[in-house]
Amino acid sequence: MTNGIRASQLFQNLPVYWSFREVLSLEQPIHTWIPLITEALRQFFAKCEPSQRIRSELPPHLSVTGDVYIGRNVSLPPFGTIEGPAYIDDECILRPSVYVRGNVIVGRGCVLGNSCEFKNSLLLEHVQVPHFNYVGDSILGNGAHLGAGCILSNLRLDQQCVCMQMPTGEKIQTGLRKLGAILGDGAQAGCNSVLQPGACLFPNAVVYPCESFKGTRLAKSAKALSQTDKNSLQ
């Protein structure tokens, strides 16, 4: 199996009801999930009857095209764009001008904010992406949070394949030209921060507001937050 950071190192568990376990597992290196999102959605829609795909009322000016699943009690905006294939689970909140560009999986109770763009990405449960964010070719763990204006960059300036850094410092070749950021459960990135291609935050790790971060950050290795730092994150 390809070397890399295992999904089990970042996520405590996957939802028991999850429809994508046959394709995505905790034993896989996490970067291998990115190209598998398309296949996971293909298999889901092959089994899901069209009449069972939209379970919340669609506002008249919300554009929904392609294979799209929307669960129960989803709060949908008066305008925005959802392009399939896309899966949005129960009790999510989508805000005005949201743009789902396809190949997106969103778990229960997530917030997809105003003027936020999502492309080829996976959000587990209760993820908050509330204001002016870009999430491309990325994976966000349970309870992860992006501050306003945080960008998950997914393409190097030289357009070469993206590397990921192991906790030991060793670099792993992913073979992916486009790879955004991976956030473990409870990880946070502050307002106007930029996570460079291949950035990885372990569970509960923090990227500070306006920080440009690359590499891998372990929660236990981050400096202790001073009171000033805590105030800046509130």
How should these model regions be labeled?
Residues 56-225, 229:
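Structural signal for interior beta-strand "rungs" in well-ordered beta-sheet cores
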Residues 1-60, 199, 204, 210-211, ...:
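Terminal amphipathic alpha-helical/low-complexity segments used for targeting or macromolecular assembly
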